[in-house]
């Protein structure tokens, strides 16, 4: 039986730009803080490690190359000791971790999410199915075996999506069909509406993401919805601006956009613009019942005889090999990355390399 009542944490903080080691340690520090606070779940923003490359929206390809090189060098491989350290932190704190990160696999980057369980097991590994607009200059597409989201856990049926995936009606339909109860709507760093210039659509700033898309997801699916967001400082603006370009001086428009919503879309909490740390929420899964009793789009309020969604979870390979029986040999991304192997079987347990540094928190 899943727990029906527990505490969860939602991260709203500035990433460690272009610094994999510092980003891993800051992640572990937040996991430790959430664990010490009695949380059963902590949710991180989209590509929290090593930060969202928002510079790609503001400069041209040639200007971006030095930062792109550094970004790739500081992205996180899943079969690395850095990732195993994060898994150990989840195990040490007996906590579920929804981690957004720039995953490097061979020579391609992916907007990845991993759901790590309290034993350190990687329960779900997914990649954003389609990078948004200029994100295609940095990241590749997810595959059939890396896009499903909802997983049965002792905390209930938990799902996670990245950024504009949270307004994709087909992904929402897939998640709701699997009985999702808790949702991580992970967002990157985004400017606010005061920066909007016609004819750029309002969709392209943070306010609709926080105050329209995310509560709509909660209402349409009847889920507790946590929306972790990244932040920016003056120093962060300098680090994410290429040489020869004058950096912005006021980071406030990028901050204060994290949210937590109940299954009926009611706002639970949001941070002040100057807050950097963890938002806490007491989740009660029983509150999903009445929301879903009104509108359950996977059950009484849907007509699958009229409307159905085709889902293909097969991985399509560029090269396939024949197996010994004359068929086609297949494998999953999960198997290739060794995520099906228990944590202690992959590498000997090592101590963390930096001391725990507490972070700010808010209820």
From Swiss-Prot:
Swiss-Prot/TrEMBL catalytic activity: formamide = hydrogen cyanide + H2O
InterPro entries per record: C-N_Hydrolase, C-N_Hydrolase_sf, CN_hydrolase, Nitrilase/CN_hydratase_CS, Nitrilases_CHs
Annotated keywords: Hydrolase, Lyase
Active site per UniProt: 46 (proton acceptor), 128, 163 (nucleophile)
Ranges of residues in domain CN hydrolase: 6-285
Extent of the signal sequence: none
Annotated EC: 4.2.1.66
SUPFAM superfamilies: Carbon-nitrogen hydrolase
Induction note: By cyanide. Expressed on the host leaf surface in late stages of fungal infection.
Molecular functions (GO terms): cyanide hydratase activity; nitrilase activity
Membership in a protein family: Belongs to the carbon-nitrogen hydrolase superfamily. Nitrilase family.
Subunit structure: Oligomer of dimers, forming left-handed helical fibers.
Role noted for this protein: Catalyzes the hydration of cyanide to formamide. Degradation of cyanide may be important for plant pathogenic fungi in infection of cyanogenic plants.
Protein's name according to its UniProt entry: Cyanide hydratase
UniProt source species: Alternaria brassicicola
């Amino acid at each position: 039986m899943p727990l029906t009542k527990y505490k969860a944490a939602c991260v709203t903080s500035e990433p460690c730009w272009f610094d994999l080691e510092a980003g891993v340690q800051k992640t572990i520090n937040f996991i430790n803080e959430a664990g010490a606070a009695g949380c059963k779940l902590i949710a991180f923003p989209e590509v929290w490690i090593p930060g969202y490359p928002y510079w790609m929206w503001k400069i041209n390809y040639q200007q971006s190359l030095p930062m792109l090189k550094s970004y790739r060098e500081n992205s996180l491989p899943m079969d690395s000791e850095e990732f195993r350290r994060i898994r150990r932190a989840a195990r040490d704190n007996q906590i579920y971790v929804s981690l957004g990160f720039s995953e490097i696999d061979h020579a391609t980057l992916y907007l990845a999410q991993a759901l790590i369980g309290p034993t350190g097991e990687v329960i779900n590994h997914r990649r954003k199915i389609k990078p948004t607009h200029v994100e295609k200059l940095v990241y590749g597409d997810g595959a059939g075996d890396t896009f499903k989201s909802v997983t049965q856990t002792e905390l209930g049926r938990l799902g996670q999506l990245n950024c504009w995936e949270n307004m994709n009606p087909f992904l929402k339909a897939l998640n709701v069909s699997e009985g999702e109860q808790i949702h991580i709507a992970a967002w990157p760093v985004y400017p606010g509406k005061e920066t909007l210039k016609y004819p750029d659509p309002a969709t392209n700033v943070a306010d609709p993401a926080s105050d329209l898309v995310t509560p709509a997801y909660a209402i349409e699916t009847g889920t507790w919805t946590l929306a972790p967001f990244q932040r920016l400082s003056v120093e962060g603006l300098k680090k994410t601006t290429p040489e020869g370009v004058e950096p912005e001086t006021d980071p406030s428009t990028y901050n204060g956009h994290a949210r937590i919503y109940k299954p009926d879309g009611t706002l639970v909490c949001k941070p002040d613009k100057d807050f950097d740390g963890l938002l806490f929420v007491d989740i009660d899964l029983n509150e999903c019942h009445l929301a879903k009793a009104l509108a359950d789009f996977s059950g009484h309020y849907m007509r699958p005889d009229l409307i159905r969604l085709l889902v293909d979870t097969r991985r399509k390979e560029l090269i396939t090999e024949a197996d010994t029986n004359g068929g086609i040999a297949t494998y999953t991304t999960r198997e290739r990355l060794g995520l099906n192997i228990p944590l202690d079987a992959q590498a000997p347990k090592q101590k963390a390399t930096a001391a725990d540094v507490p972070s700010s928190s808010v209820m």
